[in-house]
Amino acid sequence: MRKEIVEKMEQLIIPPASYTILGIPLIILYIIIPIIGVALFTFIIAQRLHPLIKAAPDNRLDQFGLRVFNMLKYAVGQYKQPRYMLAGVLHIVIFAGFCILSLRSLTLVIAGIKSGYTLPLFDTWIGTIYNVLKDIAATAVLIAVVVAAIRRGVYKPERYKVPEKLGKDHTAEAIFVLAMIGGLMVADMFFEGSDLAAHMNKGIETHYFLFPLTGTWFVTYFLTFCSEATLQFCHVFFYTVHEVIFFSFLNFLPLGKHFHVITSMFNVFFMKLNKGSVKPVKWGVSDEQLDDLESFGVKNFEDFTWKHILDFYSCADCGRCADQCPANHVGRPLAPRFITIKCRDFCFDKYPLKEESIDKGPLIGSILEEDEIWSCTTCGACEEECPLLIEYIDKIVDLRRGMVDEGMVPQSLQKPLNALGKRGNPYGKTEKKRGEWTKPLLKDEGYECKILSGKKAETAEILFFADSITSYDDRIQEIGQSSFRILKACGVDFGILGPAEKDSGHEVRRFGEEMLFQDLKEKNTQAILDSGVKKIITADPHALNALKKDYDNLPPVEHVSEFLFRMIQEGKIKFKPLENQGDVYVYHDPCYLGRHNLIYDAPRVVLDAIPGLNRVEMERSRDRSFCCGGGGLMLFYEPIEETRMGKERVQMASEAGATVIVTACPFCMVNIEDGIKTSGNEGKIRAIDLVELVDQQIIK
């Protein structure tokens, strides 16, 4: 019986592969279109692979299982899309529909060559279920592309806009691609609907389950008013339209920002796995071999690694990175997406599909600007937001390495860098004074600090690594002293390196001075290993990140907030109630504690353990925290900006109703206290470090 129905179906509507016009079989056209489409696509992809092959090496094949998991989570699962809810939902609908309907499109391509072709088992109940899913998906995708096109073309959210000097606007391209996707949906609905309408007009039952209220359902009932000849025309015409759009779409993708449709899976698979770290100067070159390199960093396009060029290909130009970038927010000449857009345009110009290569010279000065690259605080907000895990910090650090190698260092950074080379700290103060922040503790409280270096070196289980700002800045020394008291109260056997300690070099490396960083790292590593400590604690997230991510073979490193969290969990410390319980506290997540090291809960648990403390959250908190302005060398840099990040952050705290801003980073303290002054909030809002608050409230 089923065979008879199929035969009757074939008699009603002639399938495209069997149709002729003026005696010419259309199957010839349906063979030519895929051949040309696939050949052209292969040529374009080969050209796009050329820059990747010429690029610098990059090691991205480790931890295969984790990479597969990340690909399933971020690329297939669209994990980060809902962070921008409307755009995210629209993208998820289109992506899910794309996954379901790609199988349909491939089947149709084959059906144009082999009449009546269906996939194995698709003539059973499996095919019925798939057809229902296909019709629902096509309807949802069509609605989504219409909404997305109106949103992109009419409402034009601010984050999509592109200043003319920074690259071309992609609105027209986005709407064109949405139109092609919508065209594929409509073509398939009319192709399927014309066949179903023909059978309905003849009263012949089909095996196709027409799901109510889908696009195919509406089209089918609309077409029942048409003649058999019209239905035949629709069947062949819309099949041809589908073929042309499908292969045009395929070949258009690698020509612009929609290349991410093809590259995103690969880009996420090869994502950076070690957050907070910085790539080596060159893969395959050890630290000991750096002296042999003729050039450092990125100066020309081919100096980028192949993964970073893949990043350029994969950017969807959604603007999320720039929308979250604090440098962009305060008017600095930096928006991460424009680095990608300009470099991708440069790549397409330098490696065109057919003309000769267009070489525009070095990147800095011709494509990218010095101030643009120095404006970045390496806070990681852009990378945290990107749904395709595009990396910016490593590119910026490599560009800075190239500029430093060419002597292109901002005037405001030259003095602190020279001081770091001579004295091991950016303030130019002597090494002998590095441990003097502990003297008031001995004088006023009788606490003597162990010095774990020098001829009279003592021994201890734990090293408290102060770093430069805690050692030399009068205000921040109070944070070190509070940390000292807390460790003493907890009965910890600890000490400091004193004169043997050098700056951790965290910002030195991220500002491109690799050889200076290596020198600081070598001296610190030797001093730490010689001390014989089994663990390191620091109150500085930048030092934490450097010692954990940039150094090798050190004892375990812990931020003081993690230590306090553990002490609370073990019941080893208790707090007395706050005296002034009318204050409203808010916690500011330091970038290098939160985004780069994923320490969000420990400081909050500590705060919530203090009786009577009323805590609120800022809108931009945790992994969306707003950078205070940057630490280390960024304190010395004089950027072009309309306002200060610290001032903006204080305003956010004020809007949350806070009267006390708590942070867990000495650099955040400097910037936030400055922000309180410049925003006119003195007397209304105050700032305190987590360890200072704990020092006040701990029962000793």
Predicted regions and their residues:
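Hydrophobic alpha-helical membrane-insertion segments
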Residues: 92-104, 175-202
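Membrane-interface segments at loop-to-transmembrane junctions
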Residues: 60-61, 65, 83-88, 122-133, ...
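Iron-sulfur-cluster electron-transfer modules
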Residues: 5-154, 303-312, 334-338, 347-555, ...
